């Protein structure tokens, strides 16, 4: 097993180093997946949209039947304190979390009064600006009738993970996932954009994928810079015929796609503008 990178977690009033055991085999979180989290980044001295990330984890908790017991200002203060435990030049992943310790009114439901929480920060380098090779996944996104898609919930990620693993087995880095209607939703690990004839397109949020904070920021920054951004229903064929494809998400922020199936792509001007605008925003 690979060693963990440098990690600090605030739990129950203390900062704990490493990967502390916070749940046991009877914990609802352990065997019933009653967890929500958010992911923010610290890099190059910036923590872009950290306020929106901590607000979202509280909304996710409520959507999952947990109690969002930590105020947003408290989260932000703890993030500031946690950052001091790392070298200033290190890129970090910032992960506020809630989970249920016990079951509730039915055995598989979380007991909101047993809500636990922590804030975990760990070193995670920003990935190099290398393009991704992507393909179409056979796995699809769930709907609000089948999964808690209105929360950033841990239970949603095994479906994304199997899409990623299946794509890797075929020699790709990531995969486009469709919704149940057969339209493009997102990549297995991030939101997705395409450009065609000078216009940027991205799937319109429809309740079947997370409308990411970085996605929203990229859309806004591009529009404010004068770029036309269209949110609409898109097919896989649209992406196969795109001039550019790029992704947005917490791990890499804005990242290019270099290949879709067997068709090679180059990082184009709209991707480069999106990335430049985001980095300027992050450091502004």
Locate predicted features:
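Ordered, amphipathic secondary-structure segments that act as subunit-interaction surfaces
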Residues: 85-97
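Helix-start/capping segments and mature chain N-termini
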Residues: 1-81, 99, 108-284
């Amino acid at each position: 097993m690979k060693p963990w990178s440098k990690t600090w977690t605030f739990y129950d009033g203390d900062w704990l180093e490493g990967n502390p055991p916070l749940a046991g085999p009877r914990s609802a979180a352990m065997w019933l997946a009653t967890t929500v989290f958010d992911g923010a980044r610290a890099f190059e001295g910036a923590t872009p949209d950290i306020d929106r990330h901590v607000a979202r984890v509280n909304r996710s908790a409520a959507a999952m039947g947990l109690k969002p017991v930590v105020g947003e200002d408290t989260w932000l203060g703890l993030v500031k304190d946690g950052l001091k435990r790392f070298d200033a030049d290190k890129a970090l992943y910032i992960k506020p979390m809630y989970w249920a310790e016990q079951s509730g009114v039915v055995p598989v439901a979380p007991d909101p009064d047993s809500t636990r929480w922590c804030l975990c920060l760990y070193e995670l380098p920003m990935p190099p600006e290398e393009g991704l090779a992507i393909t179409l996944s056979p796995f699809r996104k769930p709907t609000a009738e089948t999964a808690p898609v209105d929360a950033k919930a841990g239970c949603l990620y095994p479906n994304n993970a199997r899409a990623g693993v299946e794509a890797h087995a075929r020699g790709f880095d990531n995969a486009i996932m469709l919704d149940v209607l057969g339209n493009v939703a997102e990549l297995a690990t991030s939101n997705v954009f395409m450009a065609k004839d000078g216009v940027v397109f991205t799937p319109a949020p429809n309740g079947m994928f997370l409308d990411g904070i970085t996605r929203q920021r990229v859309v806004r920054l591009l529009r404010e810079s004068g770029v036309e951004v269209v949110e609409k229903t898109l097919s896989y064929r649209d992406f196969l015929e795109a001039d550019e494809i790029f992704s947005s998400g917490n791990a890499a922020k804005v990242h290019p796609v270099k290949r879709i199936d067997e068709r090679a792509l180059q990082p184009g001007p709209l991707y480069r503008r999106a990335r430049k605008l985001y980095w300027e925003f992050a450091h502004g």
